[in-house]
Amino acid sequence: MTCTFHAYEQLHAQPEVVAAVHTLLREVEQADGVAALGEAFLKGIDGDHGHQHIVAMTDERVVGVLALDGAVTASVSGENPTAELAVAPDVRRQGVARGMLAAAREDLGLTGPLDTWAHGDLAPARAMAEAANARRTRELHKMAVDASPGSDRGEQFRAGAEDAASKVESQGLTVLTYPEAVERFGEELVDEEWVRVNNEAFAWHPEQGGWDIDQLRSARDTAWFDPNGVLMVWSCGEDEDAAGPRCAGFHWTKIPTEEQEEPEGERAGEVYVVCLADEARGKGLGPAITMLGIGELMKRGVGTVELYVEGDNGPAVATYEGLGFGIVHTDVVYRGELN
């Protein structure tokens, strides 16, 4: 097989190549049962998000793509660039992945450590990591539970959501959807509070922490986003008038676009982001906010509830297992040298 490798600083400006890459990604997902690229990297293909790409082509089609998240900036700042890649199933183990990595060195000038996501940690990814002497540095579990209408688990979650609402109200807090909060407090304040709580909750997180309002709005700029699927818990009683309203936490739920077309009760929805402000910790609000969001997903026709949790967060994994969640698959970061 003759294969050529092309570097793109602005892949989104090449619509024919973008279309061919998406064809490849659909082929890979159908074969592997898991998407090769995550949401952020998909957005980096379709829009200007500072990503770089190596695309592997034969005369007939695109057979591989390597996506790099701000690689040059990361290298200059001393951080490790992060990558995700996909190779067509029928040309694996023929040097396509190695060729794309070599092109990243030669055409984009990348050297040093590279963190590469392997979604599902499938055998081809493990083989490539072993050949490159790469090591696991991070695991992210996808967990899911059947909460279909009429099931014991579904009824448990419905009751749990009602109890959670009572717990929140008993602490003098108010649950508002994002549009309700904007109507009451104004978009600027609500977005500032959203970012504040996010950054307090994810101060440790390599991707989710350190956001600004522009990053928040970019994250919301996606086809599946429903502002009514964001539940925010507010302290806004009379005793808070001097300081103004404060967000104690929020639960951002997600129902993917394709799932929205499924019949009610058969949709998959995600516990996408749950955050608690520092000042709200130690009051039992974290589990309550989580359950409020699960209840909202079920009201919107979700029968399978999904979430992602860090593999080294044993207490969280145990908590979700106690709620009936099981690990569906694990995404892994492998760190290897580009030199």
Swiss-Prot record:
Keywords from the UniProt entry: Acyltransferase, Repeat, Transferase
Annotated acetyl-CoA 1 binding sites: L85, A86, V87
Record carries keyword DNA-binding: no
Oligomeric and partner information: Monomer.
Pfam families documented for this protein: Acetyltransf_1, Acetyltransf_7
UniProt xrefs under PANTHER family: L-AMINO ACID N-ACETYLTRANSFERASE, MYCOTHIOL ACETYLTRANSFERASE
UniProt cross-references to InterPro entries, sorted A to Z: Acyl_CoA_acyltransferase, GNAT_dom, MshD_Acetyltransferase, Mycothiol_AcTrfase
Keyword Transferase annotated: yes
NCBIfam families: mycothiol_MshD (TIGR03448)
Residues covered by the N-acetyltransferase domain: 8-174, 176-339
EC number per UniProt: 2.3.1.189
Positions with a binding annotation for acetyl-CoA 2: V274, C275, L276
GO terms (BP aspect): mycothiol biosynthetic process
Chain's role: Catalyzes the transfer of acetyl from acetyl-CoA to desacetylmycothiol (Cys-GlcN-Ins) to form mycothiol.
Binding positions for 1D-myo-inositol 2-(L-cysteinylamino)-2-deoxy-alpha-D-glucopyranoside per the UniProt entry: E39, E207, K254, E270, Y308
Family: Belongs to the acetyltransferase family. MshD subfamily.
CDD domains in alphabetical order: NAT_SF
Protein name as it appears in the record: Mycothiol acetyltransferase
Reactions accelerated catalytically: 1D-myo-inositol 2-(L-cysteinylamino)-2-deoxy-alpha-D-glucopyranoside + acetyl-CoA = mycothiol + CoA + H(+)
Listed GO MF terms: mycothiol synthase activity; protein-N-terminal-alanine acetyltransferase activity
